Amino acid sequence: MHEITLSQRALEIIEQQAQQAGARRVTGVWLKVGAFSCVEASALTFCFELVCRGTLAEGCELHIAEQQAECWCDRCQQYVHLVSQHVRRCPHCNNDQLQIVADDGLQIQRLELE
């Protein structure tokens, strides 16, 4: 379960940003998770709540959005976007030999601070 490690790293960054802004509390966090990152949203939510206990982010509202993966199709010679790691076929030519170009893992998109 790498969700715990991702949650810990995200919290470190969130706390740094909150302290730099002089915030007393983090009330909301918006995360974007790559489609092929193998991150389970429910596990990430559980782990994030766990690591936030006793911190500025305890009790904050967590919002998770999934990001499409950008892939290159050699057969079509074009970029395609895929939402699920379970469907790795080009929507134009049905090629299953796609090269993943961008799937940005986990990104902190926005923080809500008090």
Curated annotation (Swiss-Prot):
Keyword Thylakoid attributed: no
Residues that, per the record, bind Zn(2+): 73, 76, 90, 93
HAMAP family in the record: HypA_HybF
Protein family membership: Belongs to the HypA/HybF family.
Pfam families on file: HypA (PF01155)
Name recorded for this polypeptide: Hydrogenase maturation factor HypA
Entry binding sites for Ni(2+): 2
Keyword terms, alphabetized: Metal-binding, Nickel, Zinc
PROSITE patterns: HYPA
Its job: Involved in the maturation of [NiFe] hydrogenases. Required for nickel insertion into the metal center of the hydrogenase.
GO molecular function, one term: nickel cation binding
Organism: Klebsiella pneumoniae subsp. pneumoniae (strain ATCC 700721 / MGH 78578)
Swiss-Prot/TrEMBL GO biological process terms: protein maturation; protein modification process
